[in-house]
Amino acid sequence: MDLYVQRGQQPPGDLLALAYPDDLPIPETAMVSGGYREALNSIRDRSYLMGERYAAQQMRADREGVNMQLLGFYDAFQRQLRALGVPMFVAEFVRSKDRQDELRALGTTKAVGGKSPHQYGMAFDLVHSKLGWDLTRQQWTLLGHIGKSVAARGRMKIDWGGDWEFYDPAHWQVRGWRLLVPHAS
């Protein structure tokens, strides 16, 4: 919600409900069970959340031009992760066409410049503050479950790249983003 204030904008009422619902953060016992307890413990670092480096990471990605629904989801997701003691940050929200083409050449994405939700502020890549991209499949699956639970609670239509054939577990995007940006089709 602070991002709306920084931009001098009033958040929509439904996003206010998402940002401050009575049942968020979701209790850890409802969020994590079984074998995922070990995955959670392996990515937790509550003391890191209190440090200057974590604070700086939170401001790393440019939020200019990011879809407000996506920012609302990101804010709620981050609150849930902090409540669980998991330090994460966004590597990129908005990405230039040239940067997209560079990543495609490296094989980290399939989308060409101009055809990615990142070019339109409709996606973000979430990275662990200390482990970076190097999480296990179980750790990413846990993060996917947490993010999808937050989205469901807020009735937000968000897709997770960990569910795709081209596995991209750091990636989150607005579902149906092409319909919201007609010239991207």
Segments the model singles out, each with a brief description of its role:
Residues 16-59:
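N-terminal low-complexity, Pro/Thr/Ser-rich intrinsically disordered segments
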Residues 12, 18, 22-23, 27, ...:
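Catalytic cores and adjacent binding grooves of peptidoglycan-active enzymes
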Residues 70, 92, 136, 140:
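Charged, low-complexity surface patches
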Residues 1-12:
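Intrinsically disordered, low-structural-confidence terminal and linker regions
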Residues 78-108, 153:
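Extended, low-complexity, intrinsically disordered C-terminal regulatory tails
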Residues 43-89:
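Active-site acidic/histidine clusters and adjacent loop/turn architecture
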